[in-house]
Amino acid sequence: MKDVPAFLQQSQSSGPGQAAVWHRLEELYTKKLWHQLTLEVLDFVQDPCFAQGDGLIKLYENFISEFEHRVNPLSLVEIILHVVRQMTDPNVALTFLEKTREKVKSSDEAVILCKTAIGALKLNIGDLQATKETIEDVEEMLNNLPGVTSVHSRFYDLSSKYYQTIGNHASYYKDALRFLGCVDIKDLPVSEQQERAFTLGLAGLLGEGVFNFGELLMHPVLESLRDTDRQWLIDTLYAFNSGAVDRFQTLKCAWGQQPDLAANEAQLLRKIQLLCLMEMTFTRPANHRQLTFEEIAKSAKITVNKVELLVMKALSVGLVRGSIDEVDKRVHMTWVQPRVLDLQQIKGMKDRLELWCTDVKSMEMLVEHQAQDILT
């Protein structure tokens, strides 16, 4: 049994800058006001006075451990995460988190947060297989939670870092975007916003099967790169989103300086040519989706004899649906994969909708004026 009052009294005298807080903790503990005490501790563990040393470990051992069974499980794990950061031996930290997981097993969210922290530690020490297993385990639990909770962002942060480590661009792109969807961008330092925007942009360009850039283009995190030496990435992403092959080639002087992009130039060209075909299909009216080989070749910057191969690739990966008329050298498109649209694409849809409304109005007037002839 720890002498809690003695520890709190000693802490008050040894840390005069936080004496009032220590006194408040003692008062709440004595009165057994566990909820108020939990809130006070949650705030206190983030105090700059604990930035160095092992103060949080001592706080846990001599104080928090005495009433942790009365603390809300999720709040307890939130507190424990701060304590763990002061443990220099990762194995000690892992053991501590495993014990904590047992203590909070009554709460799924608390267990998820605890397992996520365990996964983060395993990733830091390079145990990729254990990290992968933890992610798979936690993801299954996460899918059973109703809505988006406070633990989602921590999980997606872990999973995206894991995919970044193993070089899985597509999965990193997906989960890094999910992370940003769970946090307030204003809570991230500008430097972190810029780094996340840059790595996300590269992952989107390099990710196999990633053809949807609209969500990233509409996210405010990308604006952190505007008017910086990485502005070219925004321009390149917009070029890809609109399938502008010529714009992509013009920007080569910028993206060509980035080693990963330069090394995958052929792959990037194939991707933007597929996006070009998607954009051509999307911008055509539904009743006029006959594309000639010459039109496709001109926009995609390829020779006519390579058009059929490009269309077959787009059909095989499910980007478009349609048929190829080899005799007339035409492609009839019936469907294009839905994507998150940027503002320019939305404007294009608005213009086409207005044109359609005009056509409907004209037909209405025609029927009205010639109704007698039609009926007789």
Curated annotation (Swiss-Prot):
- Any Gene Ontology CC annotation: proteasome regulatory particle
Q: What species is given as this protein's source?
A: Mus musculus (Mouse)
- A single GO molecular function, which one? endopeptidase activity
In terms of InterPro entries, this protein maps to: PCI_dom (IPR000717), PSD13_N (IPR054179), PSMD13 (IPR035298), WH_DNA-bd_sf (IPR036390)
Q: Which keywords does UniProt give here?
A: Acetylation, Proteasome
Which Gene Ontology BP terms does the record give?
A: meiosis I
- The encoding gene is Psmd13
Subunit info here reads:
Component of the 19S proteasome regulatory particle complex. The 26S proteasome consists of a 20S core particle (CP) and two 19S regulatory subunits (RP). The regulatory particle is made of a lid composed of 9 subunits including PSMD13, a base containing 6 ATPases and few additional components.
> A Pfam family in this protein?
PCI
Respond yes or no to whether keyword Protease is given for this record.
no
- Residue positions, PTM N6-acetyllysine: K298
The function of this protein is: Component of the 26S proteasome, a multiprotein complex involved in the ATP-dependent degradation of ubiquitinated proteins. This complex plays a key role in the maintenance of protein homeostasis by removing misfolded or damaged proteins, which could impair cellular functions, and by removing proteins whose functions are no longer required. Therefore, the proteasome participates in numerous cellular processes, including cell cycle progression, apoptosis, or DNA damage repair.
SMART domains per the UniProt record, alphabetical: PINT
Looking up PANTHER family in the UniProt record yields:
26S PROTEASOME NON-ATPASE REGULATORY SUBUNIT 13
Q: Which family does it belong to?
A: Belongs to the proteasome subunit S11 family.
Per the record, the domain of life is Eukaryota
Name this protein carries in UniProt: 26S proteasome non-ATPase regulatory subunit 13
Q: Establish whether keyword Nuclease is in the entry.
A: no
In what residue span(s) does the PCI domain sit?
Answer: 171-338
